[in-house]
Amino acid sequence: MRTFTPKPGDINRRWLVIDAEDVVLGRLASQTAILLRGKHKATYAPHVDGGDYVIIVNAAKVALTGSKRDQKVAYRHSGYPGGLKATSYVDLLEQNPEKAVEKAIRGMIPKNSLGRQVLSKLKVYAGAEHPHAAQQPEAYTIHQVAQ
C-alpha cells in the first residue's frame, strides 16, 4: 500500500478562535500546535501543511502554574558575541503577552520551512478583540483539569 498524500483539494482548513483566559500556557501551546499542524485530522501527512488557522485571544490572561511566572526566563540572542538577552515571564507577559504565547507554541512546531509555514497560520492577540471576523472563526475550547 502506498503512502497517502493529501492533495490541495483534499485539505479543508477552518478558522478556530481560542480564548486563553485562565488556560495553562503549556496546555494551550500543545493543543494549538496539534491544530496548526493538522494532526487532529484523518488526512494528516507529516510533509504537508494541512492544519487549521488558529486565533488566540486574551493572551495577557494566560495562566502559569507554580512559581513559573516569577522564575521562568525567556532567552533570545542577537547573534553577536555577548548578545544573550534574558527576560522574566513577569516582564514578558506585561510588555508583550503575544510573544510569550508565540514562543511556547513555536517550541512545539518543527524547526524547518514547513514549521515556518505552519506558524504563519497562528494569530495571537492580547485582548479579547481580533480583526478576523470576516473569516467566521469557530470557538474552540481547551479542556483541562482544574488548577
Swiss-Prot record:
Example GO BP: negative regulation of translation
HAMAP family attached to this UniProt entry: Ribosomal_uL13
GO CC annotations on file: cytosolic large ribosomal subunit
Family, per entry: Belongs to the universal ribosomal protein uL13 family.
Keywords recorded for this protein, A-Z: Ribonucleoprotein, Ribosomal protein
Pfam families recorded: Ribosomal_L13
SUPFAM superfamilies: Ribosomal protein L13
Purpose: This protein is one of the early assembly proteins of the 50S ribosomal subunit, although it is not seen to bind rRNA by itself. It is important during the early stages of 50S assembly.
GO terms for MF: mRNA binding; structural constituent of ribosome
CDD domains listed in its UniProt record: Ribosomal_L13
Complexes and interactors: Part of the 50S ribosomal subunit.
PANTHER family on file: LARGE RIBOSOMAL SUBUNIT PROTEIN UL13M, RIBOSOMAL PROTEIN L13
Protein name: Large ribosomal subunit protein uL13
Annotated Gene3D superfamilies: Ribosomal protein L13 (3.90.1180.10)
Gene source species: Kineococcus radiotolerans (strain ATCC BAA-149 / DSM 14245 / SRS30216)
